[in-house]
Amino acid sequence: MFDKKFSELSSLPAIKEALEIAKLLTTIANAWTDNADFLCQDLQNEVAEFLHEVRQGQSNKRRIFEELGDVIFVLCRIANLFNVDVEWATKYSVDELKRRFLYLEEKYGADKIKTASQEEFFKLWKEAKGKK
């Protein structure tokens, strides 16, 4: 049963496949039923594992890769639970990022953005975030 279903989904782009598999698992495994509290805890656990691997550095690239995939899968499960379109949510986030950079470039110039210290940059970023 699983083999056939998983095989049918394997031709989808990875995020779409993850979303569909997450949906499928909630229909075939009672233990996989998602609720917000469970998913929040699961996300915290996966992010903690991911950050642990990131702190290990570049030599741990394979584990970073694996843990990032786990984080993304939990995010897909949360998206399914709340009927959030992952593509549109990502597009919105990217558009906001571009808008903030364009605001900063227009107000301060590209050189200021390039040469700002991390502290300076995040002060400017906070300003840009407040502008809609």
Predicted regions and their residues:
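Flexible "arm" and connector segments at domain edges
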Residues: 1-68, 73-132
